[in-house]
Amino acid sequence: MKTNLSSQITLHRVSPRYYRPENAFEKSVLTRLEKIPTDIYESVEEGANYIACEIAQTIREKQKAGRFCVLALPGGNSPSHVYSELIRMHKEEGLSFRNVIVFNMYEYYPLTADAINSNFNALKEMLLDHVDIDKQNIFTPDGTIAKDTIFEYCRLYEQRIESFGGIDIALLGIGRVGNIAFNEPGSRLNSTTRLILLDNASRNEASKIFGTIENTPISSITMGVSTILGAKKVYLLAWGENKAAMIKECVEGPISDTIPASYLQTHNNAHVAIDLSASMNLTRIQRPWLVTSCEWNDKLIRSAIVWLCQLTGKPILKLTNKDYNENGLSELLALFGSAYNVNIKIFNDLQHTITGWPGGKPNADDTYRPERAKPYPKRVVIFSPHPDDDVISMGGTLRRLVEQKHEVHVAYETSGNIAVGDEEVVRFMHFINGFNQIFNNSEDLVISEKYAEIRKFLKEKKDGDMDSRDILTIKGLIRRGEARTASSYNNIPLDRVHFLDLPFYETGKIQKNPISEADVEIVRNLLREIKPHQIFVAGDLADPHGTHRVCTDAVFAAVDLEKEEGAKWLKDCRIWMYRGAWAEWEIENIEMAVPISPEELRAKRNSILKHQSQMESAPFLGNDERLFWQRSEDRNRGTATLYDQLGLASYEAMEAFVEYIPL
């Protein structure tokens, strides 16, 4: 069973010669804008395994010399694959950590003595508890020390690092604001280990660990920039498209305290290891025509023309030969003969992505339409990772499919229970208890006792405590009710609303279980029952919480199993990926764009507002301060504006989709 198919999605084929040059000359040409040596790997596993091998080699070399190997290690998601490979090498290849010294790069402050959400605990769970390292060789900042002793404590931490001869290897991730460890924007090049106040972006990111922004510590004790740069070798890791923007700033941008990771440009032995998704904003991947000759394909041509339009401020049909020649695109003139020929091709390509019939227009020529006309009506399944992603990401299209008489099913893949605030539980329990009393059912003590029990639990609940199973159930019921209300508003019969409650999600914690066969079978059974002609899935692979990717992997795994068995329904089914909750499709990748009128946009907003528990007080709004309906409208209007600027029809808003073809 293949459970990581989303990681193999490439929106456009990147020629291997852009990221795996054949010789030193080619590499120097491709990377001439990059100021830190950067290696791009086809997968996270490939990159992580390479870094793990480099670390293992250093450990073994130090062992032979009878010396310690000093590692500075972070927590977080980026190094987790490296740690997994090191554990495998320890268990299967005899890699010993007896000569390894580990310094934890940072710790949240303040923490209570029994805090379970510390960075050090994460580091132990991911690596230290699984290898034979001497516990006396592990050092970490103390998140519980008194404030008046922190300055001296940090000075001694630096001394301890130096007492072992300095750091041999520093392993880094890169934060959303370009931070390394918790060196936030504004950190100085000569900074050492210190207490630092976390900015809102870092606290929002850390809130995934602590549950809510209110529970997240306001500061951190972190290794300084100069401490990290003092390492003999530095590896910066980044995986996934949500890291792409910061990688470009770090690798190609100027050295600046606004992007602390850019300080790595001053190190003579720093290396950046990224996967293809994280490389997408680097010039050699995103705009290869600026550094080399290109292997042109339709999507790369479209990307180049959109870029040229934005650079010149012109719509597609007004671009001239001069525009192409002056901006590194003369190869296209040689291929097509003139700007006019290129312009017409790309204009028509984009024009053909626009359709007001997302399920296909019956009795019409579908040669140049993104969806086929037959069969009509279609059976449609919209997979929604959380109980509101359907309306946030494709509420306009969903409503259009219903109005055009297709059989629309919505499958809510997870309960979304941990994203409901405690005050929502109290509010609903007030109602249930009051209802019980008003309608002469007060002698039934079950409700009143459960009401008192839940009130007591929530009152005594401490930061980091897990909700009881009863409270998680109530939170799940709240979200089910909201989803049903939104579905009814969109005229979807409730017998076509499916709550899958995939088991991987039901941990009661932010950290979820890995996807399992049970998750895939639930999805597969639904597909077998409905036999859809269209499937819509979440394409928000940069979702900061990871649930969207796992849910999409469950659908893709189920489809893959059906494909292996030769399921007949799959031969007449198309799969479309939507975005909207966390990002939007780039225009060069869009294959279907559904226009939304002002009235339809208002209806979409109303659908989103049915999910009242996900408004201002929702625990997981991410780093974007806008509410979900605001983000959605801004992105939909932004897509329509871009089409307008390129010289195509002007609409109020547009929802965009990319087709997924089973591998």
UniProtKB/Swiss-Prot annotation:
Q: What are the disulphide bonds in this sequence?
A: none
Listed Gene3D superfamilies: 3.40.50.1360, LmbE-like (3.40.50.10320)
* Single annotated GO MF: glucosamine-6-phosphate deaminase activity
Stretch list, region Glucosamine-6-phosphate deaminase-like = 1-290
Tell me, what's a Pfam family for it?
Glucosamine_iso
Active-site residues are E184
Q: Which domain of life is it from?
A: Bacteria
Stated family: In the N-terminal section; belongs to the glucosamine/galactosamine-6-phosphate isomerase family. NagB subfamily.
* PANTHER family, alphabetized: GLUCOSAMINE-6-PHOSPHATE DEAMINASE-LIKE PROTEIN BT_0258-RELATED, GLUCOSAMINE-6-PHOSPHATE ISOMERASE
Identification of the protein by name: Putative glucosamine-6-phosphate deaminase-like protein BT_0258
